[in-house]
Amino acid sequence: GAVFGYAASKVNKIQKIEVKKETLKESITEEVEHKSGYLNVAVFGLDSRDGSLDKGNRSDTIMIASLNKATGEVKLVSVYRDTLLKLDDGSYNKANAAYSYFGPDGGVALLNENMDMNIEKYVSVNFNALVDVIDAVGGMDLELTDAEVVHMNNYCVETSKVTGKDYEKIEPEVE
């Protein structure tokens, strides 16, 4: 209940980018346009350091959330960001380049064209949104090797500066 309420309050603060529906529909083939019963939403996790959600940011995370309208069941599929796929301009590049070069409409077009999807809606989040969600659920417990602890501490310094949030240095476990 409390996590849902917190998440709902954050949704109202989401930065929105207007994309013409016609632009998204251009990448939907006639065959998949007529499929119904599901709502497919593209989810992009961006490497944005300045809070922007438009082109120029690579999508480190690319997922498709598919909602079965009859049952309410949601399935998530991740698309590996380094997968070589056809971009909106006909060239081939890593999947995460589509958002950077063409913005969210290019990211959605990439999924529609290469995955035979009918996606018309998308959600883009940056580091701040990820930190807020982790805080809302009370943090995360991870098992890390000593080498991973070193990398996480380095990463946390940058993330802390970007998000304006404090963090506690991770100490290796002593056995």
Model regions: which residues?
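Non-catalytic, solvent-exposed segments at the cell envelope interface
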Residues: 3-175
